[in-house]
């Protein structure tokens, strides 16, 4: 008996796959490599996708019409996922979970009264949550936002700068995964940058400090800072020419001063080591960004005797800097007033991040104006 041919079925399957791929390509009208998509934060272009690495990294652009679709995918390890936040026409649009491993459209609905709309996309989670990929957009038309000579700020910090534990609208504290309440859009750093109309980059790692982590000796932020992916796994180095900050604002020390988790042995805070390694980190930053001024921040989470100790350490770093670099303007120091954090795991919530941003804004306006005079 003659065997039935499998060729028609094979051709049908191939045709179906091709049609599916073609449809996907037709739906995504504008790929991530397009110049209209202005890259923000710590990102790298990988094949046809833009990899969003650090907290608040993303893209911004303008689109015509009353809707667009943003194609994203999640490249976190195992069953982890990411979150993305959107800002549409200067207003917060919302946060969405990205747990799909292949490109998927996320719909954005705009007001039909305007021809053009500005969309900003922010990675709400952080580098250690894994990669978030931006593949492109479906829309009637897209174009770049208008370029302005913006102030450029880089914030180097820990979980507070990441926006950990500040957004409980979908997942209450003590529920879900440790990063389910992350929202870098509502970090004090992002808030104050928007208030100052500044372009900004967050180099922040939850749990890490100047010379140790909150409950262990590693990692430290300086040990990971020069990695393109803010981790110890990648050999790829960061491109320091892609973002040239006017000011580098450092908010590190909370985790160094931490008492730990009560399980692992914890040595007493070593102020001499903290001062020395903080200054060494400043030297690294000078070698990478010689044009930048520095601002050193205390923490509203550190109180009483520890706050006094922390502040005195920053003054010591400032004095050492002035001694070694007499030709450079000394780092400025901002002392945060104490805040009783009501977010998750002892972190500030969105309102408390707003308080921090207001405090920091007044300081930054003052020192920036002084630097310009």
Which positions does each model-derived feature cover?
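N-terminal secretory targeting modules
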Residues: 2-5, 19-156, 160-181, 373
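Active-site segments of SGNH/GDSL-like serine hydrolases
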Residues: 251-256, 281-313
């Amino acid at each position: 008996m003659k065997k039935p041919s499998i060729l028609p079925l094979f051709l049908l399957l191939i045709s179906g796959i091709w049609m599916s791929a073609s449809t996907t390509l037709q739906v995504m009208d504008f790929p991530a490599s397009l110049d209209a998509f202005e890259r923000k934060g710590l990102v790298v272009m990988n094949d046809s996708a833009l990899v969003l690495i650090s907290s608040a990294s993303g893209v911004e652009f303008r689109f015509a019409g009353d809707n667009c679709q943003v194609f994203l995918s999640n490249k976190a390890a195992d069953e982890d996922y990411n979150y993305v936040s959107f800002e549409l026409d200067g207003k917060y649009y919302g946060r969405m979970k990205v747990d799909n491993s292949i490109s998927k459209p996320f719909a954005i609905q705009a007001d039909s009264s305007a021809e053009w709309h500005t969309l900003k996309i922010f990675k709400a989670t952080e580098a250690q949550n894994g990669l978030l990929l931006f593949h492109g957009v479906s829309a009637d038309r897209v174009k770049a936002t208008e370029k302005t000579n913006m102030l450029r700020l880089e914030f180097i910090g820990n979980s507070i700068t990441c926006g950990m534990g500040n957004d409980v609208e979908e997942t209450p504290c003590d529920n879900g995964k440790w990063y389910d309440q992350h929202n870098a859009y509502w970090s004090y750093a992002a808030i104050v940058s928007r208030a100052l109309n500044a372009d900004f980059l967050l180099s922040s790692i939850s749990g890490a400090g100047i010379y140790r982590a909150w409950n262990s000796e590693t990692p430290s932020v300086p040990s990971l800072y020069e990695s393109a992916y803010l981790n110890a796994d990648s050999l790829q180095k960061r491109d320091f020419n892609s973002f040239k900050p006017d000011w580098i604002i450092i908010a590190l020390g909370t985790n160094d001063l931490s008492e730990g988790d009560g399980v692992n042995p914890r040595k007493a805070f070593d102020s001499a080591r903290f001062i020395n390694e903080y200054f060494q980190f400043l030297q690294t930053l000078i070698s990478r960004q010689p044009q930048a001024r520095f601002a050193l921040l205390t923490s509203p989470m550190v109180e009483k005797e520890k706050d006094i100790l922390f502040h005195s350490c920053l003054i010591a770093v400032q004095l050492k800097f002035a001694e070694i670099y007499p030709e450079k303007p000394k780092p400025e120091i901002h002392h945060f007033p104490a805040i009783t954090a009501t977010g998750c795991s002892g972190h500030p919530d969105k309102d408390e991040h707003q308080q921090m941003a207001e405090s920091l804004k007044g300081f930054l306006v003052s020192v920036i104006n002084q630097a310009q005079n």
